[in-house]
Design a protein with these regions (language model features):
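Jelly-roll (double-stranded beta-helix
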Residues: 1-222
Length: 222
């Protein structure tokens, strides 16, 4: 397993696909074919929404967004597909096939984005609240090949409960991301133990998995 700790300085700024906004790319999973075509298997990013505008369309993809800060936005994807995102840290899943218009409630806001090619991946997004000293243990699905922990509030200590206690834990600060990526040669850890560092802590836990996982196990389908 490969573990990478990223700070906001590592996130790559880029324009939205439709050119109407800005996103900071945290991680993207691409093959050589994707590099040539501009596609991807999965992507994690933070978008800054400064004005109301249409969202970029991602045909064949499932999306999950989480409001990080600001008053929020209203999303209109057609009849029966309206959603108000005004409460931070509440995941909302919808289809990238939809034409979605965004109206800001009051001023700019930011949101965390998970996008997966539904033919090649599924995503699960959970919000985890921690209070010291009680830790939480995260357990992998057999289909998981990437985990990401993004700290929404506070700071977290992350360790492998199956390793000797002498193994040093990792400290993950607010808006930093811990990526844990498995491969055939080095599978993903089955468990992670997460604790709050000194105060109330809130995390986004994102799992990217192969499509063999059932829809009931994922949060990616609208």
């Amino acid at each position: 397993m490969r573990t990478t700790l990223l700070s906001p300085a590592d996130y790559r700024p880029m324009p939205w696909k439709n050119g109407l906004g800005t996103t900071h790319e945290i991680w993207v999973g691409r093959t050589a074919h994707d590099e040539a075509t501009g596609g991807f298997r999965a992507r994690l990013s933070i978008a800054t929404v400064s004005v109301g505008s249409p969202f970029s369309r991602f045909a064949g993809c499932d999306r999950i967004i989480v409001l990080l800060d600001g008053a929020g936005m209203r999303l209109d994807s057609g009849p029966g597909r309206q959603q108000v995102l005004s409460q931070p840290h509440q995941p909302y899943a919808f289809s990238g096939d939809w034409d979605t218009d965004c109206t800001l409630i009051e001023g700019p806001c930011r949101d965390f984005n998970v996008i997966v090619d539904r033919q090649r991946a599924r995503a699960e997004v959970r919000v985890i609240s921690l209070s010291p000293p009680q830790p939480a243990t995260l357990t992998a699905s057999p289909q998981d090949d990437l985990w990401a922990l993004f700290v929404l509030q506070g700071a977290a200590t992350v360790s492998d409960p199956d390793q000797p206690p002498t193994s040093p834990p990792l400290s993950v600060q607010r808006e930093h991301t811990l990526l844990c990526q498995g491969s055939e040669q080095a599978p993903l850890l089955r468990r992670l133990q997460v604790s709050a560092e000194g105060g109330e802590t809130r995390l986004l836990w994102i799992a990217i998995r192969t499509p063999e996982a059932t829809a009931a196990d994922t949060g990616a389908r609208p």
